[in-house]
Amino acid sequence: EWLHNKMEFDFDNFSNLSKENRETLKKRFYLPKLEYKEHQISVEDDTEKFLFELQDNRLIESVLIGHKNRYTLCVSSQIGCLLGCDFCATALMNYERNLEVSEILLQYYYVEKYLREKNETLSNVVFMGMGEPFLNYDNVIESINMLNSKSGLNVSKRNFTISTSGIVPAIKKFTEEEHQINLAVSLHSVKDNVRSQLMPINKKYPLTELKSALVNYQIKTKNRITFEYILIDELNCEKKDAFDLAAFL
């Protein structure tokens, strides 16, 4: 009631419990918290950025995207990132660690609570913030399971999307476990030399391996895949690139 539905993280505010019970909770349990450090609102593209400070003083960012009375939350899964993608701002940060399940959940809870105060609610969640979600696989999946739980907020798994740079072993595991969670792939080129330049992870998991894993995913789950493709002048946006992309898909 208090944690998941009312999103209250101070035992003292659990008003339907006796003072004695609240004191017992405080002695036996610890509730992690985030601290708002910054909140930026952009009227131009209807986005809001939330900068949170964790218990160890590290910072993470979540982005709220509004569109036609629907709200999508872009959450982080790691502090920094190991992959060094050429077009990503997180690549400029040092990788520090994976986020805990609680730290992923709190991004959702804090922003959902913020929206409820305006009589709004989150529609979708995308793991497209800081970090590679499939390099924090267990915690990402567990956080989704908890939000999906009937004991939690009972959010449909279809409302979640995990975006990956192409971690092939994790895609295979994701396929075998048959999650009803949407999958997105950061692609940006279907030429190995170009994609490796943009995304060094392609050297470890080249396009042939990635495509094989994705084809198997579609065959087994019957789910659609979203492909992300940033147009970069003189690199991946010629007419031939479009035809090559169509052939790959």
Give the positions of each predicted feature.
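Conserved AdoMet/S-adenosylmethionine-binding subsite of the radical SAM
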Residues: 112-124, 129-249
